Amino acid sequence: MSKILIAFASMSGNTEEIAELIKTSIEPLGHEIEMKEIENINTQKLLEYDGIILGAYTWGDGELPYEVEDFYDDIETLDLTGKKVAVFGSGDHAYPKFCAAVDILEERLMACGAEIVEQGLKVELAPETEEDIERCITFAFNFAGRLEGAAL
């Protein structure tokens, strides 16, 4: 099975809640999963994973949160060619750029050669509705399936 990293930044707990939901959805499939806060990631270690799932909330008017900035800068020099990745995030529609951190991270990962295998998951605040929970589970299953080469 594949080695997967789920790295996230969460201020209010919403993004961490999504990360936990993704992790518990993938775990029964037999993958080796490591979950860490993004600010504790040595970016060189990303090369050791078969799949990478990143999560971040959006700060202010569509910016990356402070704890993601160093990570974002550090991955610019990495060659992530062949790495299968996906990005998720929490946001608030009260702000003009809903979940912009998801798009910012996807763009950087693609610029580094990574393959986005599942469209970014954007959740309003926390996954509290049945629909949001189902979207998180589907995101997780699709990522795991595409990591193994077959979309679910």
List each model region and its residues:
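Short, Lys/Arg-enriched, disordered terminal segments
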Residues: M1-S2, L152
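FMN-binding flavodoxin-like domain, especially the glycine-rich phosphate-binding loop
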Residues: E17, S25-L29, E34, E48-L152
